[in-house]
Amino acid sequence: MALTLASAADLLKEHHLLREIIQGDVWTDDPARIASADEPFAGITYDTRKVTPGTLLCCKGQFKAEYLNGIDEAGLAAYVAETEYSAATATPGLIVNDARKAMSLLSAAFYGYPQNELTVIGVTGTKGKTTTSYFTQALINAVSGGKAALFSSVDNCLDGHTYVESDLTTPESMDAFRMMREAADNGMKYLVMEVSSQAYKVDRVYGLTFDVAAFLNISPDHISPIEHPTFEDYLYCKRQIIVNAKSLVLGADSLHADLLREDAEAAGIGVTTFALHDADNAGTSADVVAWPADPAHASFHIADGDQALGDYHLSIDGDFNYLNAAAAIAIAHAVGVSLDDADALHAIESVRIAGRMEQFRDPQSNTLAIVDYAHNYASVTALLDFVYERWGEENPRITLVTGSAGNKAYDRRKEIVEAAENRIANFIFTAEDTDTEPIIDICMEMQGYITNKDVVSTVISDRLTAITNAIYDARAHADRFNILLIIGKGNERWIKDHRKHVPFDGDDHVVERMFGL
């Protein structure tokens, strides 16, 4: 059914969001008093620059009346907002208590509730969301004939095989429902999507129920005035995925796992757990468990209870990725994938993600470069754990090339330093994404957190120069085994600066070019 002003008003009333409808001097609760109430909207947008004849505009966030200049001439049909703009437009306004919640509900309705045509899987956690999501999509694609779509912080995939770079971990609600509609129209039957804490903080997934929610882990992150004021708020927002799910897959070793189980019990949903053990039966009890198959940790056994699921050798290094693999298998099983389908389960082995644990060897020196998205205490610690487990006996000289995001997650700056300073030889602080905060200020702040007098630190604000200098420095110490950890940006081809995406080669391409690969 097409979305009209009348049906939009009814939907908003149902969710106790509609305050009134205003058009000029008409203030009403009855859409029948508006002449155009039964005319279907031709489009929906939250960007005034994209308004065309028949469009419903959602005014959210820091919306300003001046954005409406010339909007009637563009063909605006109606708007949704928390305040009325009768002085700027002659079109009717649906005045609501919460514009973001309203936008999510109306977007779902406009696109014909595409989530009802998909089995929707939500993946949240402080670390591992992207890798787990890719593993899950690969596994489900293997059994469904490529019918799994993906929304991730790296790429979106709406047809099971074509990947396009994404902008947000969880898209704006309107974009999410538009992409769901496209995925469903492309014949997709499943959707795997990363769900950030901000998605619940700002209602990007309001009204969406997940067939399966995966809660991987939790540790402090995203604490800042513009994200979450406290860890409690961060965790509370993350927990909302459980309230809005039909089934939960839970990391058995997650902090506050007991609280998360209580949430699931209160919601009346079942829980499937997963865990990583040091050896068979040497760890927290869980339904799906991974543990090393050999002393070198080159492959891992995975089992579901008493059912052995085989040995796995992933294309992405790191023991923690076998934990992500166990999570993906638990998720797939929760949506009905048979654990007897060995070919499907082993589809995770071939998954590679650009910018995730990518390794490059320098032909000119004994240097290994690892490009990864690690960007907080937990992920930097996990990365260094992997390095020491794999190469610790070779006494590597480790250089960390890092920055930290501007204008948010301020605690990360100190935490990255704390995670690394007693385990590396050198820091090179450099550019990462920022809005208005100067890159050099962020780098200097991070340098100021160093307490280990033996670690060397340098600030090189230009990221290309920072990576280049790290490589030249490693070559100058060719008598040592050098490991360069270049973190935070992965394969992203831009750096955000003053709200603009400035073109950048990508850490992986810079390393490949310097190494002559």
Swiss-Prot record:
UniProt subcellular location: Cytoplasm
Predominant cellular place of this UniProt entry's protein: cytoplasm
Positions of UDP-N-acetyl-alpha-D-muramoyl-L-alanyl-D-glutamate binding: T48, T169, T170, S196, R204
PTMs per UniProt: Carboxylation is probably crucial for Mg(2+) binding and, consequently, for the gamma-phosphate positioning of ATP.
Coiled coil: none
InterPro entries given in the database record: Mur-like_cat_sf, Mur_ligase_C, Mur_ligase_C_dom_sf, Mur_ligase_cen, MurE/MurF_N, UDP-N-AcMur-Glu-dNH2Pim_ligase
Keywords: ATP-binding, Cell cycle, Cell division, Cell shape, Cell wall biogenesis/degradation, Cytoplasm, Ligase, Nucleotide-binding, Peptidoglycan synthesis
Domain of life: Bacteria
Entry binding sites for ATP: G125, T126, K127, G128, K129, T130, T131
Keyword Transcription applies: no
Documented EC number(s): 6.3.2.-
Residue numbers bearing the N6-carboxylysine modification: K238
One Gene Ontology term of the molecular function aspect: acid-amino acid ligase activity
A GO CC term attached to the entry: cytoplasm
UniProt pathway annotation: Cell wall biogenesis; peptidoglycan biosynthesis
SUPFAM superfamilies, per the entry: MurD-like peptide ligases, catalytic domain, MurD-like peptide ligases, peptide-binding domain, MurE/MurF N-terminal domain
One GO BP: peptidoglycan biosynthetic process
Family membership noted in the UniProt record: Belongs to the MurCDEF family. MurE subfamily.
Protein task: Catalyzes the addition of an amino acid to the nucleotide precursor UDP-N-acetylmuramoyl-L-alanyl-D-glutamate (UMAG) in the biosynthesis of bacterial cell-wall peptidoglycan.
PANTHER family to which the protein is assigned, alphabetical: MUR LIGASE FAMILY MEMBER, UDP-N-ACETYLMURAMOYL-L-ALANYL-D-GLUTAMATE--2,6-DIAMINOPIMELATE LIGASE MURE HOMOLOG, CHLOROPLASTIC
Protein name: UDP-N-acetylmuramyl-tripeptide synthetase
Organism field: Bifidobacterium longum (strain NCC 2705)
Taxonomic lineage from the root: Bacteria, Bacillati, Actinomycetota, Actinomycetes, Bifidobacteriales
Gene: murE
